[in-house]
């Protein structure tokens, strides 16, 4: 296997996450602008003006850029849909991710590459064959197992099922991140409860709440093991990514456009390393254990294998929010970087910072820097800790920009 045959696709909801993904070695990024994307409400979406800047950054870095246009589209949305795809064409975005045939057809008409969204729930080779007239990359349903994926891949190869560009259709699958309790994300709970449609990018995440179960006739509350009965654990595939590669998956999609840059960086880096390791023969239990430990440090609701290995019932989280082994605490902001010395000046605005603390620095150009504090200087003197109100300097291995944010990682207490 050649590592260049595979692609890590990173989620991007901010410039910090964009630069973090690029730094981690992502091959492509996906993002949304304003409306018509499945994270229109939950992530900090970009504007049409951002589209051109993101496309330029990605081209300069050799990274593909994918724009999501994958919500349910009504007649009154057609003009907006066309204007968004027109902007994608002008910005030279690599492809759009679509689920509505209207978006696919229009993109094809004006020469914009199309990739298919998980919202289509493509679960068999014949459905893929039909949609191949529109798309060069197809994401398969998250409910499939690896035997089913392999069958679809073998059909593509045997029948030479090609997309509009004339190349065999590439299979994309989710590799890591949040899962929906509904099939391929087609959920109506949010619409029913809050008149806020998940299928229009406005999911209120009410499945993540805790619930009690009562007998309607007797009024008795049932004793259930877990109150989070509709909130799945997060998908993690790094311990069997070799099986996915062997089954024909070529694009590995990471969920998390609403997550921070440290999440994007850590997850992308781990999966990139795993793919490279399998290709060069160093994929083993020791490496998997190291990646598992790193993945546990960033946002997660606990992990499971999804349905990929044949499991038919979901696994549900036992908590609300993140179960990461550590949390980031805001400490201060960047003031100046002294490149010759490799030292950054920060203003401490909250809490304390100690020698030995692990920190993360984030910014729209910086992306993310993760390192330990080896030395702290305050008024030219070495000190053991820094406190609120002080301007301090610490060695930093990369350039820090004014107003970059400084966080301290703390161990999360259960």
UniProtKB/Swiss-Prot annotation:
Protease among keywords: yes
PROSITE patterns, per the entry:
PEPTIDASE_U32
Enzyme Commission code: 3.4.-.-
What cofactor does this one take?
a metal cation
- What processes does the entry annotate via GO biological process terms? biosynthetic process; proteolysis
Tell whether Protease is among the UniProt keywords.
Answer: yes
Gene Ontology molecular function: peptidase activity
To which protein family does this belong? Belongs to the peptidase U32 family.
Query: What is the protein name given in its UniProt record?
Result: Collagenase
This protein's species is Porphyromonas gingivalis (strain ATCC BAA-308 / W83)
* Species classification: Bacteria, Pseudomonadati, Bacteroidota, Bacteroidia, Bacteroidales
């Amino acid at each position: 296997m050649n590592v260049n045959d595979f692609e890590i696709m990173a989620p991007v909801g901010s410039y910090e996450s964009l630069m973090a993904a690029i730094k981690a070695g992502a091959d492509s990024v996906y993002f949304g602008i304003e409306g018509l994307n499945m994270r229109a409400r939950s992530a900090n979406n970009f504007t049409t003006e951002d589209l051109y800047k993101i496309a330029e950054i990605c081209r300069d870095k050799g990274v593909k850029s994918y724009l999501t246009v994958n919500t349910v589209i009504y007649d009154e949305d057609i003009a907006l849909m066309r204007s968004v795809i027109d902007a994608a064409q002008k910005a030279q975005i690599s492809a759009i991710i679509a689920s509505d045939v209207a978006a696919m057809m229009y993109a094809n008409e004006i020469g914009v590459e199309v990739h298919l969204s998980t919202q289509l729930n493509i679960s068999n080779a014949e459905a893929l064959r039909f949609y191949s007239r529109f798309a060069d990359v197809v994401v398969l349903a998250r409910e499939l197992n690896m035997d089913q994926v392999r069958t679809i891949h073998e059909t593509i190869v045997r029948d030479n099922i090609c997309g509009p560009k004339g190349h065999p259709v590439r299979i994309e699958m989710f590799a890591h991140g949040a899962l929906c309790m509904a099939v391929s994300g087609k959920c109506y709970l949010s619409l029913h409860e809050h008149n806020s449609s998940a299928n229009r990018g406005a999911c209120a995440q009410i499945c993540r709440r805790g619930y009690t179960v009562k007998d309607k006739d007797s009024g008795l509350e049932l004793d259930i093991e877990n109150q989070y009965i509709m909130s799945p654990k997060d998908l993690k595939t790094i311990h069997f990514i070799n099986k996915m590669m062997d089954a024909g998956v070529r694009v590995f999609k990471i969920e998390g456009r609403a997550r921070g840059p440290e999440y994007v960086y850590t997850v992308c880096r781990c999966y990139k390393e795993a793919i490279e390791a399998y290709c060069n023969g160093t994929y083993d239990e020791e490496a998997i254990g190291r990646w598992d430990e790193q993945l546990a440090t960033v946002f997660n609701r606990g992990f499971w294998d999804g349905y990929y290995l044949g499991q038919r019932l979901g696994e549900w989280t036992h908590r609300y929010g993140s179960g990461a082994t550590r949390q980031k605490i805001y400490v201060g902001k960047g003031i100046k970087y002294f490149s010759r010395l490799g030292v950054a000046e920060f203003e401490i605005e909250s809490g304390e910072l100690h020698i030995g603390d692990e920190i993360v620095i984030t910014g729209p150009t910086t992306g993310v820097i993760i390192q330990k504090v080896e030395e702290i200087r305050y008024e030219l003197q070495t000190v053991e800790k820094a406190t609120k109100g002080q301007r301090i300097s610490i060695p930093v291995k990369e350039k820090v920009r004014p107003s970059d944010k400084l966080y301290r990682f703390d161990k999360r207490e259960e």
